[in-house]
Curated annotation (Swiss-Prot):
Subcellular location, record wording: Plastid, Chloroplast thylakoid membrane
Main location: plastid
Source organism (scientific name): Emiliania huxleyi (Coccolithophore)
A matching Pfam family: OSCP
Reported function: F(1)F(0) ATP synthase produces ATP from ADP in the presence of a proton or sodium gradient. F-type ATPases consist of two structural domains, F(1) containing the extramembraneous catalytic core and F(0) containing the membrane proton channel, linked together by a central stalk and a peripheral stalk. During catalysis, ATP synthesis in the catalytic domain of F(1) is coupled via a rotary mechanism of the central stalk subunits to proton translocation.
Stated name of the protein: ATP synthase subunit delta, chloroplastic
Length: 180
């Protein structure tokens, strides 16, 4: 709940800035890159969330890791988050920004968590199936790998959850056996 309260104003401010500068597409691409980095690097997330690490160190790492891949305005926004002590909420801010940005373009976001990295073909197939199910013009996948799923994947889109994971099936069996 706290993450949402913090994430929404920053995401809305970044969206407003991107619209004012006619750079929504570039900013969305930048935030997508940031989001992928965070999804693939738990170490980076921990580093940014660690209150014992100085702001200058966090800024330096962000510049080194993302500086060449994202635009100057987005990097400045990240530095602002560091200065305000909100960089630990970057994942939530990025997700909320992408959600708002895509909503403006009639694009749905689906959080896909799988036990292994999905191939490009698997991603395409999932996106096509979700388009048919939701009726959305376009689907963007927010990918995450969680080996604890054992096998399969989960999809969160809107308020719906599709769980085809082995862990989910084991929970269902456990619940059924517990009810007997």
């Amino acid at each position: 709940m706290l993450v949402v309260k913090i994430a929404v104003p920053y995401a809305e401010a970044l969206l407003e800035l991107a619209n004012a500068n006619s750079s929504l597409k570039e900013t969305t691409n930048d935030i997508n890159i940031v989001s992928q980095f965070l999804a693939n690097s738990s170490d980076l997330k921990k580093f940014l969330g660690n209150p014992l690490i100085t702001r200058d160190a966090k800024k330096g790492v962000l510049k080194d890791v993302l500086g060449e891949q994202i635009g100057e305005k987005t990097l400045t926004f990240l530095m602002l988050l560091v200065d305000r002590g909100r960089i630990a909420y970057l994942d939530g801010i990025a997700y909320k920004f992408l959600e708002l940005s895509y909503k403006e373009e009639s694009i749905e976001i689906a959080k896909v968590t799988s036990s292994v990295q999905l191939s490009a073909q698997q991603q395409k197939t999932i996106a096509e199936k979700l388009k048919k199910i939701t009726g959305a013009k376009q689907i963007k996948l927010a990918l995450k790998v969680d080996p604890q799923l054992i096998g399969g994947f989960t999809i969160e889109i809107g308020s719906k959850l599709i769980d085809t994971s082995i862990r989910g099936q084991l929970k269902q069996i456990s619940t059924l056996l517990g009810a007997v």
